[in-house]
Amino acid sequence: MVENIGSGSAELVSYAKLNLYLDVLGKRSDGYHEIVGLFQTISLHDTLTVEICDRGFYLESSVALPSDNTIKRAWEMFRKNTGKEFGLKVTLKKKIPVGSGLGGGSSNAAAVLRYLGEVFKIPLEDLLNIAAQVGSDVPFFLYGGTALVRGRGEIVEKLEDIEGYSVDLFFPGIHSSTKEMYLSLTPEMYRKGPGRVEELHRAYLERDYEKIRKLSYNVFEKVFLEKHPEVMDGLRNFGDGSIVKMMTGSGSAFFALYPLDKGNYSFVGGV
């Protein structure tokens, strides 16, 4: 979502995501892992104020970010792929925890790419190509809502948006490294999920809670809890009465799924 706020600035909303399903199918020859997942945006969001300038990149953030952050990479890859020469000023108000598996960095990058695409009239197909160069989850965030995601994350099939659900989140304050979590996987862990992602999507649409519980899966959850057994204490008191409780992404956040309005954050539709 883009809102013009005057003086050449625009305010962007950057939503978090959940992995309602996430499995790793194997390791590819290029070093990436082949995944399959059901992704869903939720109402937890960061806010970015952006302004195009003559030259340079300027970022003011409410939390510390690395110098090679995803917002800067989005700006660099956009310029490289389009040949457009311009600078960018960004103010980021962060609400999505860093290292939580909620996709905040990828969502920030996608919000900037979507805005630049509107300004410079770049087609979505070209933006998707740029997004894949910025990060594996970035293409999904150009769509948002509900999607089946494959490949290393760059193959996105938009699905009918799931509505009528909400979640509570548990963040144990641990920064979970995506790279380390993938390195912790062994071939025996691949393809262990039910694999019926389309069926899980239908179960959400049909409010089949029993099937949702049966088909939900995250390959990283067991690995994460083995690395951080202390998290179990907090999880015992989290998500009472929920439909399902599970980890998102490569951690460290967990979500508890409820019917609409019972959780703090609602499912958000896509573009």
Swiss-Prot record:
The keyword Cell cycle does not apply. GO terms for molecular function: 4-(cytidine 5'-diphospho)-2-C-methyl-D-erythritol kinase activity; ATP binding. It catalyses: 4-CDP-2-C-methyl-D-erythritol + ATP = 4-CDP-2-C-methyl-D-erythritol 2-phosphate + ADP + H(+). Keywords: ATP-binding, Isoprene biosynthesis, Kinase, Nucleotide-binding, Transferase. It is an enzyme of class 2 (transferase). GO terms for biological process: isopentenyl diphosphate biosynthetic process, methylerythritol 4-phosphate pathway; terpenoid biosynthetic process. The active site is at K17, D137. ATP binds at P97, V98, G99, S100, G101, L102, G103, G104, G105, S106, S107. Its EC number is 2.7.1.148. This is 4-diphosphocytidyl-2-C-methyl-D-erythritol kinase. The gene is ispE.
